[in-house]
């Protein structure tokens, strides 16, 4: 590569020799980022196509969303059934939920389980925003109209409500509890 770019003299440079060592931060970062498992995970779960009014957009997982998803995986692998991921305003909660519907559907399908997903909000404007965002990302969104509908949905344990085989999520306002 150095010869192709007409800079073979760099090979004898002390910086070049230092950066070829296994313990350099750059080498560790590149190797961890492009490990087969991580790269496969990112290609399979870390890209979303969003049907935006201005045209189709490609969204990618941010690194905190990747770390959150991997933390969920670690907790599930240890047998834990609940947990909290703390997010701040504008940190990509809706995107994380979308990415995890994809990821957790595959995770549980390996165990023969069809999961049901709920996205709970505390305001009507957030409910509408979440419904719109999930729909734009290709999820089937199931709105809950009343407390009775919500109770029936949980009691019946019906995990899919569409015949197209689309991934789905139920968006509910906390006031329906």
Located regions from the model:
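ATP-dependent helicase/translocase motor core
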Residues: 1-121, 125, 129-141, 165-166, ...
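Inter-Walker segment of RecA-like/P-loop motor cores
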Residues: 138-177
């Amino acid at each position: 590569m150095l010869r192709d770019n007409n800079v073979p003299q760099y090979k004898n440079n002390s910086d070049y020799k230092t950066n070829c060592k296994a313990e350099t931060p750059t080498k560790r970062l590149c190797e961890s980022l492009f490990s087969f498992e991580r790269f496969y995970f990112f290609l399979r779960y870390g890209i979303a196509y969003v049907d935006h009014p201005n045209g189709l957009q490609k969204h990618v997982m941010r690194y905190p969303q990747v770390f959150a998803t991997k933390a969920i995986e670690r907790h599930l692998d240890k047998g834990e059934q609940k947990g909290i991921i703390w997010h701040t305003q504008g940190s990509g909660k809706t995107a994380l939920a979308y990415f995890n519907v994809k990821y957790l559907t595959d995770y549980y399908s390996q165990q023969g389980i069809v999961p049901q997903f709920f996205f709970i909000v505390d305001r009507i404007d957030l409910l509408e925003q979440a419904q719109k965002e999930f729909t734009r990302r290709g999820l089937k969104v199931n709105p809950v109209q009343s407390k009775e509908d919500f109770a029936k949905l949980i009691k019946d344990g019906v995990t899919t409500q569409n015949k197209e085989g689309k991934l789905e999520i139920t968006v509910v306002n906390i006031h329906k509890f």
